[in-house]
Amino acid sequence: MQYPTISEYVKASQDASDNLDMSTEATKAELNEAITDEFGVKYSKDGRKLLKASRKLNGTYSIKEGVRIICDEAFYYCTSLSSLVIPNSVTSIGDSAFCGCRSLTDIVIPDSVTSIGNCAFSDCCSLSSLVVPDSVVNLKSNPFCRCDGGLKCLSPYFVYVNKVLFDKDKSKIIAFRNKNTTSYIIPDGVTSIVNGAFGYCSSLRSVVIPDSVTSIGDYAFSDCYSLSNIVIPDSVTSIGNSAFGDCEFLRSVVIPDSVTSIGDGAFGECYSLCSLVLPDGITSIGNYAFADCRSLSEIVIPSSVTSIGDYAFSGCESLKSIVIPDGVTSIGESAFDGCESLRSVVIPDGVTSIGDSAFAFCNFPNDLKQELISRFGEKIFG
């Protein structure tokens, strides 16, 4: 039997150690054992991870050599940080690592970096330009939301054309960065609109989604304040959390029967939404799914639904009546809280659970209110 040499053994041990915990999360244990430098920046005990910077950090800061991971939210809202030097040892930049660094004007991503996390540079509004080096193989959702400076992408794993970032096959739309465009036609062949792809595109009024798209990610169109017209094709099967959240001028939506999953807050705070058709295939309505849709006066809940989530329709102050289908067994906490115009509700015998304040501030006739109290107790009215 041939045994490894000492040098081979040492290298193997180092390689194994390298892969032990290269997560971008700063764990509680790591933070408890952290080494803090003179600027209030916390590093992991072994020096491989930059865990957390003080929000008081200002001016220029140089990350220590040997750091491999810049953790999630490491420089979160360090609003006085103006310049950052990242060493060539860094391979991963975590989720929201530089989110809210509004004074940051100068940063160079070294060509050692292979992964950039969700919203890594979100709200870096003073950053005039950013270069994605050719070493980057992984961009988690849209790293550049509300970061409107110039972008240059050298990585062969992505395509950046006309201020729109795609994966190399152009099957995923990652970041739409043309902030002045009022309408956009997503190219045929795109199958996925990733998390945050169109987030905060405040001038965008209409988007055409092709039949090739099957999924709309979390926050995909969130805070597109001017978006008033969108057609979801019947190829789409899932709509992510807060996918259309805060689309204040979105007036009507038809969700096709192909959709089986609607995420939490998917249409929350769509204040102008007055017309909504839900698909027959969905089994649950998520938490906050249509919360604060103030103009929504009627909705038909399909018979396939078995549960209505917490705050699902809370604040829908124009909603006048609702019929809960026979298949529903549970209605979440504050599900219809603040539906001031709601005067009629039909709750089937199959409902076994109604959360606290589910119908708080609903103006039911007294006889209906007493009937519901006798069935479910006073807690459902807060």
List where the protein language model places each region.
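Consensus positions within tandem repeat domains that build extended binding/scaffold surfaces
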Residues: 72-73, 94-97, 117-120, 141-143, ...
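Active-site beta-strand termini and strand-to-loop segments that position acidic
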Residues: 167
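Structural signature of tandem-repeat unit edges
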Residues: 1-2, 8, 22-42, 48, ...
